[in-house]
Amino acid sequence: MSADENNLIWIDLEMTGLDPERDRIIEIATLVTDASLNILAEGPTIAVHQSDAQLALMDDWNVRTHTGSGLVDRVKASTMGERDAELATIEFLKTWVPAGKSPICGNSIGQDRRFLFKYMPELEAYFHYRYLDVSTLKELARRWKPEILAGFTKQGTHQAMDDIRESVAELAYYREHFIKL
């Protein structure tokens, strides 16, 4: 398949916390959809190696969540650093979307972009400057039509690929039930 500038790149990161000055990326996953939200391909899901010292900085929520999902063990066992994960992700994306064309897509994606800017700047630059943030629609629905929210439930596994799939499904749900096309 040739790269299509209308395809959308969806991304999710798991981090050791929310502060890019202190915390680090521990998992990255991407997938590509067409403009109609049909999933075309899933990219690599990569546990990003971090030192024991870095992992020790996690707060209780992150320790509990990422240990429970098995991510901490995968991070410790991983041989891929941030740069390797960045390059593998870009290599996957080149097949599906030309550089600079897709907005960065996901849930609360501004937070992920802050970490990409700091730790994976080449990948961050691969995206268009625009955002397709599903959480914007969630916040609007909460204020304008709160009953809509009951129709979509997330599993909340805090595993990157699961979270991306849920983001795509959530946007499709809002397209059907909230946005008048």
Swiss-Prot record:
GO MF, one example: 3'-5'-RNA exonuclease activity
GO biological process: DNA metabolic process
Domain Exonuclease: 8-171
GO cellular component: cytoplasm
Location within or outside the cell: Cytoplasm
EC number: 3.1.15.-
Domain of life where this protein originates: Bacteria
Pfam families associated with the record: RNase_T
CDD domains: Orn
Function according to Swiss-Prot or TrEMBL: 3'-to-5' exoribonuclease specific for small oligoribonucleotides.
The name this protein goes by in its record: Oligoribonuclease
